[in-house]
Swiss-Prot record:
It is a multi-pass membrane protein. Belongs to the UPF0324 family. InterPro entries: UPF0324_pro. GO terms for cellular component: plasma membrane. This is UPF0324 membrane protein BL1094. The chain crosses the membrane at residues 12-33, 43-65, 86-108, 112-129, 138-160, 175-197, 239-256, 271-293, 300-321, 331-353. It is found in: Cell membrane. The lineage of its organism: Bacteria, Bacillati, Actinomycetota, Actinomycetes, Bifidobacteriales. Keywords: Cell membrane, Membrane, Transmembrane, Transmembrane helix. Pfam families: Cons_hypoth698.
Amino acid sequence: MREFCTKWWKRIATVDMLFIGVLTLLASLFASWLKQFPGFSLFGALIIALLIGMIIQFPIRSAYVGSNDGRKAGVKDAAGLISNKLLRLGIILLGFKLNLAVLFTQGIKCLPIAAVVVTLTIIVCYAIARKLGVDPMLAILTAGGTGICGAAAVMGLAGSIKVPEDKQDEKDNDVTMAVAIVAIMGTVFALLEIALGPLTGMTKDQLGITAGASLHEIAHAVAGGDAFGAVDIATIMKLSRVLMLVFAAIIIAIWWEKKHSEVQSTGKKTVAFPWFMLGFIGASIIGTFVPFVTSITPQLVDFAYIVLGMAMAALGINVNFKAIASKGKKPMLASFLTSILLMCFAAGVAMLFF
């Protein structure tokens, strides 16, 4: 235990960790401030934080790292540690946003729809991506982000998948690429649904369900629902999909371990069970049924987004632009085609059941 603590203290207590920690915190806070303005609100704080991280990597390299190899390794390790560990903490804290009492009362019809939507979307998007030649990691992350809840889903699923140490950089690039793809697709389809919604003849509740069942980020679903005067039903539908992240993360972790894992096993076969998802459920239960916690839920959720924003900014700092440029077109096409099918399916379900 002492050796473990010493090892982690040496890794954390560095100038590079302090520098990157402060930068990612500032990036996250700035993103949270920016999201309140028109235009930025459609992207949400997490996507903005990722973009800030991608931008500031250039002055970090030129002004701070320079030709110092030790500093370069320190920055990379610090950003990697922040993106990995704060991701899990942020997902756990995000559980406070999920009010189970509301979901199992007002949203009782939304839960089975969410289960079907998430399952079909992940399967279809993954199949299309693989058919186009996308590697399994990027394909499943893009599928999960498209089907569940955008950036948070990509990061949640990434935390459930183990890769060898020498493949961690490639995995981080895939995470960044998948986040960027679902952010772009979510924005495009949010604008498309807002424009086409009034022309369909659907009721406002049907339009709200369609937005919640088909749009990628929570911010997209809220924007779509608000445009139709159905923000409450859109949010409930979207949060029903968010709940599916728990089951998707567990199932995908088991599937990945059996089909694609490259981690060397030492004896007994184990599965990379996403234990932090139990924390997510625990936070949901506490946030729903403990009165004191319920009263401070907005503050806890704000803190969750700050933590996740730090993780996203750290991802942006380590991103490899050449890798993204060479691999991004096919998964984006897969997400685009799936998003069209998802929008049509969600509209059909909304008209049938609401």
